[in-house]
Amino acid sequence: MPWIQIKINSTGGQAETLSDALMENGAVSVTFQDSHDNPVFEPLPGETLLWGDTDVIGLFDAETEMSAVIAELENHPALGAGFRHKIEQIEDKDWEREWMDNFHPMQFGHRLWICPSWREIPEPDAVNVMLDPGLAFGTGTHPTTALCLQWLDGLDLAGKTVIDFGCGSGILAIAALKLGAARAIGIDIDPQAIQASRDNAERNGVSGRLELYLPKDQPADLSADVVVANILAGPLRELAPLIGCLPRQGGLLGLSGILASQAESVCEAYREKFALDPVAEREEWCRITGVHR
């Protein structure tokens, strides 16, 4: 069955009230989308994350009289007569099947593969992490995750302890364990991420070597041979005093979630304690690595 979609640009502060207005006028679903594709944190449980410039997208049954919906929305205080919007008809698809068909095993570096469970493993003798996309956490498709996976693949992790700061799906911690690390520690602000990491670790047979913590529960004396943090430039700068103390003397640090234009400001926050390598870039994103002095 086809559907009608309306897209309205809004500020983050008005988006939720527009969502309510769309639902009151017959929308079967409403979603929020960043107008500029800016990276953001995962929201805390119970929070709705909104950008400064947000597209509010309502989906209606194909038989909906949209002129009547528009007339009602023009009375909304955030819109008014003649508000800008885009309406289009979209065809119904088996979205789940299409999505599954488009998700393939991916190789990172020389040894490491990330494989969905419904695909045949391309290299059975390689290091294979089985990971199905689920919650909005890393699966390897984003350039920042790919940069971190490639970095881990190039390290000798045998017997090492690795901290994955902002672990999301646990993909980096699990990859480190499969690459030979003796122990991994995942830290995330979101309980859903902790659960996703736990589930993925069990699927990959490494749950006994993965410790998971919310920040409030993590031990005070945490340290590791390798620390990887794939979050965002702002938090990486703000949390530099904390993250910078996690690698042991001579330990390795890998940072990503950083736009290339933000690299220098992040480097500046870590340069005092770390001998930094040249910045690695991929599709306007970058990775910063270094050794704890």
UniProtKB/Swiss-Prot annotation:
Recorded catalytic activity of this chain's protein: L-lysyl-[protein] + 3 S-adenosyl-L-methionine = N(6),N(6),N(6)-trimethyl-L-lysyl-[protein] + 3 S-adenosyl-L-homocysteine + 3 H(+)
Matches recorded under InterPro entries: Ribosomal_L11_MeTrfase_PrmA, Ribosomal_PrmA_MeTrfase, SAM-dependent_MTases_sf
Pfam families, A to Z: PrmA (PF06325)
Database matches in SUPFAM superfamilies: S-adenosyl-L-methionine-dependent methyltransferases
Keywords assigned: Cytoplasm, Methyltransferase, S-adenosyl-L-methionine, Transferase
GO biological process: methylation
Main location: cytoplasm
Catalytic activity, EC: 2.1.1.-
Record keyword Transit peptide present: no
Protein family membership: Belongs to the methyltransferase superfamily. PrmA family.
Function, as annotated: Methylates ribosomal protein L11.
Protein name, as recorded: Ribosomal protein L11 methyltransferase
Gene: prmA
